Amino acid sequence: MSTMTPAEIVSELDKHIIGQGRAKKAVAVALRNRWRRQQVEEPLRQEITPKNILMIGPTGVGKTEIARRLAKLADAPFIKIEATKFTEVGYVGRDVDSIVRDLIEISVKQTRETEMRKVRTKAEDQAEDRILDILLPSARPVGFGASSGAADTVDEGSTTRQTFRKRLREGLLDDKEVELDVEQPQVGMDIMGPPGMEDMTEQIRSMFANIGGGKKTRRKMKVKEALKALTDEEAARMLNDEEVKTKAVQNVEQNGIVFLDEIDKIASRNEAGGGEVSRQGVQRDLLPLVEGTTINTKYGMVKTDHILFIASGAFHLAKPSDLIPELQGRFPIRVELDSLSVNDFESILVSTDASLVKQYQALLATEDVHLEFADDGIRRLAEIAYAVNEKTENIGARRLYTVIEKLLEEVSFAAGNHSGRTVQIDAAYVDRALNEVAEDEDLSRYVL
């Protein structure tokens, strides 16, 4: 679990997301409260439930990006999923219980990786020994009953072994080929199951995956590759699978986070039925999950009482009040995200750690073409993106992808023929490339 303070979390989010201070603070406090709850004594700890968050804002302003970055910071089981993937129980499609099943799979993988890191050093030593046994089969220490004359051979072999171990750790033997027995990876089988029968489908899939598991095959590979394969094999052997499963379930129950995107798409604006699968049915199915229930998974029963749910939606066509009242009540914290201004667009282009400008400069630098963006060029790009959003559909920061792609279309196409060239992107260059398209509203609808 992350031990970062809210200020540290917001600072980390600021590196990738421009503006939206209220949303950042809300998720930062929610994440910190997970840690705070763990410090509370047990009788009261069970009573402290997470305060779920509903983020409301137009498309392209950073809702999904906050989720992506939060997943990396959380250091806890985290799943981002679209509400539109689910259908009401009884219809063809996935039911909402599969959210928890997917989350527990993520937790098992995380827990396994964490436990493997703990035994990594020991596993590496054992893998080195197995490699050295292959490289120096005669240098192994002799057992009981060895003649006294063999002692010198053992000492000499031990010295040689240490020399080879040193060379192995320095990477001097990486390119040498060895032949060894390695465990066959478990090959999964994709099985289509009926809706509502995910547990049975998963058990059948696991049964087929275990067939042939544990068998060894003889392979030739480089020492570097063999060392990695043997280290993974040794580390996996040291793990207690039951302990991993228990920790994974506990981690989901205490620290799990579900980010439910596009929740506005299941908000129904009218009471009349239609040809579509009932949206209200999906909302009703979500209720017990968000409130707290017990879901049966292949790793055991998982309680959802302390899982944090963060929902987001643009709410262009529907309003938060169009959600059924019971579901509204289960998201007590509401945060509105602001539409992006010209200044925000400008900051998105240059101020974030992996800004669009840096990405395109790095891409074209691979062909020895150097892009230099002048300040007035950046400003003009931001103004055009903002203007097109105002005149046509407002798709937020995603408009910048379209605009900059159109701007650099010719440069990217001919990059191979202009090695060593420096391209200066100023306001005049931007106007020449985009003005005609940006000014023509009909054309910009299709091109930008």
From Swiss-Prot:
It comes from Paraburkholderia xenovorans (strain LB400). InterPro entries: AAA+_ATPase, ATP-dep_Clp_protease_ClpX, ATPase_AAA_core, Clp_ATPase_C, HslU, P-loop_NTPase. GO terms for biological process: protein unfolding; proteolysis involved in protein catabolic process. It holds the Pfam family AAA_2. GO terms for molecular function: ATP binding; ATP hydrolysis activity; peptidase activity; proteasome-activating activity. A double ring-shaped homohexamer of HslV is capped on each side by a ring-shaped HslU homohexamer. The assembly of the HslU/HslV complex is dependent on binding of ATP. The keyword RNA-binding does not apply. It is found in: Cytoplasm. Belongs to the ClpX chaperone family. HslU subfamily. Its main location: cytoplasm. ATPase subunit of a proteasome-like degradation complex; this subunit has chaperone activity. The binding of ATP and its subsequent hydrolysis by HslU are essential for unfolding of protein substrates subsequently hydrolyzed by HslV. HslU recognizes the N-terminal part of its protein substrates and unfolds these before they are guided to HslV for hydrolysis. Keywords: ATP-binding, Chaperone, Cytoplasm, Nucleotide-binding, Stress response. ATP binds at residues 18, 60-65, 261, 326, 398. This is ATP-dependent protease ATPase subunit HslU. It comes from the Bacteria. GO terms for cellular component: HslUV protease complex.
